[in-house]
Each structure stands twice: as C-alpha cells, then as structure tokens.
Amino acid sequence: MDKTSYANLARAWEYVENHAYSRQTQALLDAREQAAQCGLAQGSAAQAQLLHTLACMMRSTSVITIGSGSLVEIVQLVDALHGTGQLTAVDSSTQGIALSRKMFFALSDTTQTTLRAVNAPV
C-alpha cells in the first residue's frame, strides 16, 4: 500500500466513526460524557455499534463485557438485548463499576434487562 491508500483508508474509517457517532442516542451521549468527566476512556462509536449488531445477529440473551468503565458498550449491549436477558459487567476499577451501576439504574425504567456488576481488581 502506498501513502495515498493509507490516507484513503484513514478517511474511510473517519467517515464510519463520524456516522456511528452521529447516530448515537441521548443515553449513549450521556454515558460518554459521564465517562469523560470521570477520566474513563471509551471505545469508538463504531466499535460499540458493531457489538450491538453482533449481539442482535446472535439473538443474545446474556452478554458479558470486560473492561475498565466501558459505559458506551454497556448501553449498546443493553439496547441489543431488547429489554430482556442479563448483562454481566466485569470491571477492574471501582470507579468504573460504580458508574456502570449508576448508569444502569438510570436505564432501569426502560428495560427489564438485569445487571450483574462484578469488580475484579487486577
């Protein structure tokens, strides 16, 4: 690949990310903002959308997320469970797991999905 190919690939990925970000719900934007305020880095919008798509395609009823304060992914996976099932969030930081619980509590009026939050310090 030459320099032009790399530049075109970067532009394509930028377009995909911007498109995924523009489609985020208010709950996702709020989760991203809360995480930023706490200093928890989040994955890309496209990555979270891909997880949502995969969970829907597999008709998942139970999913596990492992990471440090992966709030955006949690919101996407709760949506992918269509208000049912169980989400297990394993987090290495106490701050991340506390924020996950708080965020999930805010969603509890709109979903029957259950949360199992586990703090696993490294």
Enumerate the predicted regions with their spans.
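N-terminal auxiliary segments of SAM/dcSAM-dependent transferases
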Residues: 1-25
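Alpha-helical elements of Rossmann-like donor-binding domains used by nucleotide-donor carbohydrate transfer enzymes
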Residues: 11, 15, 30, 50-53
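Arginine residue identity/basic-tract feature
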Residues: 11-13, 23, 32, 59, ...
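N-terminal start-of-chain detector that recognizes signal peptides
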Residues: 14-15, 35-37, 89
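Conserved SAM-binding loop and adjacent beta-strand
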Residues: 21-23, 36-50, 56
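Short, basic/glycine-rich phosphate-binding loops at helix/coil junctions
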Residues: 28-34
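S-adenosylmethionine/decaboxylated-SAM
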Residues: 45, 49-122
